[in-house]
């Protein structure tokens, strides 16, 4: 049995949004992938610290976070970080998916989160990239 894990950072200024995302994705988004360890970030500084240290395999950013939203943060990270980890942005409305595309996000989740869709989306993104934290 493998002891490898995948580290996912979940960013939102609201703890209940982070919890909703974590619950929807689950600790094992797919049987062929390692278990997930979640890191919660409530501030931009926390996200930047983890990304700068290269310790996360995937970021899930709340598009509605305040004062800086996940879409703007995604765009900044993709523009400024070499080998930026993949990013999934969670938006409130389906109509906001185009903004997530602008943000260079690798995938989009739409609230209310469906656990099957959330896990499948995250699994698809994780399958495209090597795990760096394991």
What spans do the regions from the language model cover?
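His-Asp phosphorelay/catalytic-motif detector in bacterial-type signaling
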Residues: 81-86
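Conserved phosphotransfer microenvironments
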Residues: 57-78
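C-terminal output helix
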Residues: 20, 113-122
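Acidic, metal-coordinating helix/loop segments flanking the phosphotransfer/catalytic sites
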Residues: 41-58
């Amino acid at each position: 049995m493998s002891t490898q894990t995948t580290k996912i950072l979940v960013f939102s200024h609201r703890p209940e949004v982070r919890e909703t995302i974590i619950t929807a994705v689950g600790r094992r988004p797919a049987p062929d992938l390692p278990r997930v360890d979640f890191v919660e970030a409530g501030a931009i500084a926390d996200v930047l610290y983890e990304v700068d240290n290269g310790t996360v395999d995937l970021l899930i950013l709340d598009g509605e976070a305040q004062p800086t939203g996940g879409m703007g943060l995604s765009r900044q990270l993709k523009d400024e970080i070499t080998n930026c980890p993949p990013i999934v942005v969670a938006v409130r409305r389906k109509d906001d998916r185009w903004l997530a595309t602008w943000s260079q996000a690798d995938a989009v989740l739409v609230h209310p989160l469906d656990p099957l869709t959330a896990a499948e989306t995250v699994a698809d993104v994780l399958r495209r990239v090597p795990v760096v934290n394991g």
